[in-house]
């Protein structure tokens, strides 16, 4: 077993405490990440301590803006190597998780992690956000949708809010200051049925990396015309014309 003192200290700074089995699951996850990263592009961060800080603890920092409840349904949009969805599932075993990504080879990796960690009530799905949001099985079905994908908040809101049930939350993870980006996203939130509740800015434990969690509540149903097809949410985000 590796020296997890940095991880344990970081968890405590988040008000969390994991048992031995959960810590072992994170170690296996790391080993699989490095193994698969040798033949496919999953992460540029490979040192154990750095993965702990910039992937594991960053993923778990969700608790700074949202208190996970037993039986919550969570969608991780554009999950990539499984962040933040898999760390959240390890820490909260009762969480129901769907990981979605547009690259099928990543889904193979995610399924391997799910199987090796013997995680239940979690699945990985290959698909594009614009297409899957049209399906009744997914539209407005989740208590919380999260994303660490690098895109403007207005774009992410159009891709993610259609999946959030009324009264639920969409929470994107962002780097640094987001004031201008949030001002830009105001019109998109109006169109999509979202309302900004708060933004929480903090530094990751033992780093000077500034992160912001944007807590957007779903206050009304998203019109059926969203998300727009053909890559429009990313190419032409919903921004108020001046």
From Swiss-Prot:
Its EC number is 2.1.1.-. Keywords: Cytoplasm, Methyltransferase, rRNA processing, S-adenosyl-L-methionine, Transferase. InterPro entries: rRNA_ssu_MeTfrase_G, SAM-dependent_MTases_sf. The keyword Metal-binding does not apply. One of its GO terms (cellular component) is cytosol. S-adenosyl-L-methionine binds at residues 78, 83, 129-130, 148. It is found in: Cytoplasm. One of its GO terms (molecular function) is rRNA (guanine-N7-)-methyltransferase activity. SUPFAM superfamilies: S-adenosyl-L-methionine-dependent methyltransferases. Specifically methylates the N7 position of a guanine in 16S rRNA. Belongs to the methyltransferase superfamily. RNA methyltransferase RsmG family. This is Ribosomal RNA small subunit methyltransferase G. The gene is rsmG.
